[in-house]
């Protein structure tokens, strides 16, 4: 559609339990499609696309440390990454009633995002997939990036006249799968 925004809504982004994937290096479409829609906290993978703030959410590889030393067999200017430097920050809109989890009518992605992002020391796979709208099923050929991360304390962002948000800057836990094509 000609009027569709450049950045959306063609991005799906969320979290998964570290126990969700049988093989984290080869996630399947079936595993990705077990998404609870972001409101079922008993699941193990959550789509938070509609709860995350586009302007303040980051899922990127920063400048990686590289080994620039060359042997006689390498081309000039070649550099091998020695350590990846992912930058993952999820900033979610706060729910109006974040503590109500027993009333299913009050649950939404903002509630789920708060409960997943507010606490320190929880490990997840942060994931992103570009190309389909939130809620669309994953299929063979779709691409997904995921990184194992750990939460820090969620930081509230409250300002006069603005939306209340919670921001989580994740710590990287060394497992990275970047732009992987789903094959099964």
Segments (PLM) and residue ranges:
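Short, surface-exposed, charge-dense and proline/glycine-enriched linear segments
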Residues: 6-8, 12, 100-104, 170-172
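Mixed-charge, glycine-accented linear interaction segment located at domain edges/termini
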Residues: 143-184
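Solvent-exposed edge beta-strands and adjacent loop segments
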Residues: 2-95, 148-163
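Extracellular/virion structural assembly segments
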Residues: 69-146, 175-184
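Short N-terminal helix-initiation segments at or just after the protein's N-terminus
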Residues: 18-37, 103-118, 166-180
């Amino acid at each position: 559609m000609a009027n569709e925004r450049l950045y959306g809504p063609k991005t799906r982004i969320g979290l998964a339990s570290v126990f969700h994937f049988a093989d984290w290096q080869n996630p399947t479409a079936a595993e990705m499609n077990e998404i609870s829609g972001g409101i079922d906290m008993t699941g193990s993978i959550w789509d938070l696309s509609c709860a995350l703030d586009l302007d303040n959410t980051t899922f990127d590889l920063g400048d990686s440390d590289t080994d620039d030393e060359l042997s006689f067999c390498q081309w000039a200017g070649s550099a091998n990454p020695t350590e990846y430097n992912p930058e993952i920050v999820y900033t979610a809109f706060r729910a109006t009633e974040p503590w109500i989890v027993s009333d299913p009518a009050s649950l939404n992605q903002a509630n789920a995002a708060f409960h997943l992002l507010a606490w320190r020391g929880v490990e997840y796979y942060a994931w992103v997939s570009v190309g389909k709208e939130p809620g669309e099923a994953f299929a063979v050929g779709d691409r997904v990036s995921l990184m194992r991360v750990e939460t820090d304390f969620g930081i509230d962002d409250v300002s006069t006249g603005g939306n209340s948000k919670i921001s989580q800057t994740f710590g990287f836990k060394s497992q990275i799968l970047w732009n992987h094509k789903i094959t099964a």
